[in-house]
Amino acid sequence: MAMATIAAQIDNHDVRVADAVVWRSQAVPRFLKLLRDFKPDVVGFTSMTFQYDTTAGFAYLAKQFDRHIKTVLGGYHATLFSDAIATGQDVGLWDFILRGEGDFAFGEMLDSIEDGGKGMDKILGLSYKEEGLFRHNPARPLEDLTRIRIPARDKRLLKGFHMYFRQADVIETSRGCLHLCNFCSIREMYGRSFRLFPLERVLADIEDAYSRGARHIFCTDDNITLDMDRFEQLCEGVIRLKLKNLMFTTQASPIGFAHRPDIAKKMVKAGFVSIFLGIENGSTKNLRTMHKPNTLDTIQRGVEALQKEGIIVIAGIINGLPEDDPESMRENYQFIKNMGITSVMDQIMTPYPKTPMRDEMIEAERVANFTDFRWYDGYFSNVRTSQLSPEELNFVRWKIRREVIGMWRATPGDWKFFKGYTYLWEFFFRHVVWLNERLLELIFGIEGRYKLQMRQYMQLNNFGIEIPGRRRIESYHPVYGNHADPYKDTRWSLLKERLPFPWRKRLKGIPCKQ
């Protein structure tokens, strides 16, 4: 969405947008095909911290294809880590770095490139090269959201985004958050601010996505319920549009629904079927450690208000706080389960750059991985607690979730909005998955099953691009320790470990297929 929004603000250049996530295993050949077909002068990338290595790999491919291509990096990681990128080993991969919001800065940069670099030093938020060294222009003020046109969805080269088995799209109705959560990097991107897009613009954006086939829309707002009156107006506006068979999912804090439980009824009428709630933790002590404004009471009241209307609640929780141990993590999952929530997106506390939590954990000597950002995706541990090493934290979190939450079970909301798929899951696929899990656990053991699943997670951001000569400042792995081979465990190698000794000896010479 961010790239399509930037494209919509550019009038004087031919811009196309592609999302490499859709490609997965075919990412490299398809990217090279795009370069051959379009022969671009400039290739821009956006990246979260955990995606940076992959992004650098694509920039390398672009430079190898044509050394005259100008490469640009924007997004969260570029904003938070611009100094390190500008002086690090990847400096040769990037010609420009865009810090902060790029809605208009990208177009200004393109105009300057076309004009031979004239006025480059006047583009706020831009870092560019002079004689091979990066020069950082002053920071860019926050944009006036009333000036930003809706995303240019016609510029997308790739289709195939789905959610709940429906064609999906994304919108934003606001930017920023006023909360002071110390693990979050939003303040480094937007400051402590909360800005609203005009309601008319939001509704036009929804209609545009719908006209292009979207039947499920995800709202990407950082905290859409900071202004509950405005959120109510949004629901009323969507109801007036009368768009048939359109559903919504959003992310929010439970606080707003605890104070305004009545809005849940309008949400359902507008088409909101599910919501990702930043619950974060079931411990008052840990909520205070994270500087969360939530209390256990507001969390429970907010969840109850949504569940009463049949809205599916997806709980976002964080483990790996400084004093966490197996018992506190078990209590965290049990708190979620006791509220009747079966969809859980759990993460391990990640020390993102420029966050207060990172500084606090470094001072307390809790950070285990400072610079290998491949693992900064929430799935893997990059910290240690007072009770657990990074490897122990990773395994214990996985095991306790498996024991307490277990496999997903349908809630009343699932039966209400997705009855057919829910029947299929509850009466067929759930039993197949359960049997598969039991067999895998029987064959490989609990630790073997854990390693196989971690190996699957490793592939989520692995596009198979290697940059020759690129070195890592530190060698880190959250599952195997710092000096082990992260891909050594395959189904075959783990099976051999489980076999009785004579069979292991007999099979010793048989290679493990990678």
Please state what every model-predicted region is.
Residues 84-104, 264-274, 331-346:
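Structural recognition of alpha->loop->beta junctions
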Residues 70-72, 98, 249, 276, ...:
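Structural detector of well-ordered beta-strand residues that form the stable sheet scaffold
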Residues 38, 66, 89, 212-213, ...:
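A structural signal for short coil/turn segments at secondary-structure junctions
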Residues 2, 6-141, 348, 354:
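Glycine-rich beta-alpha loop elements in corrinoid/cobalamin-binding modules
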Residues 146-314, 319-321, 326-334:
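Radical SAM [4Fe-4S] cluster-binding motif and immediate context
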Residues 21, 48, 76-77, 220-227, ...:
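Short, solvent-exposed turn/loop segments enriched in Gly/Ser/Thr/Pro and often Arg
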Residues 12, 32, 41, 93, ...:
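Radical SAM enzyme core and accessory elements
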Residues 81-82, 179, 229, 285-290, ...:
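Flexible glycine/acidic-rich beta-alpha junction loops that bind and position SAM and/or redox cofactors
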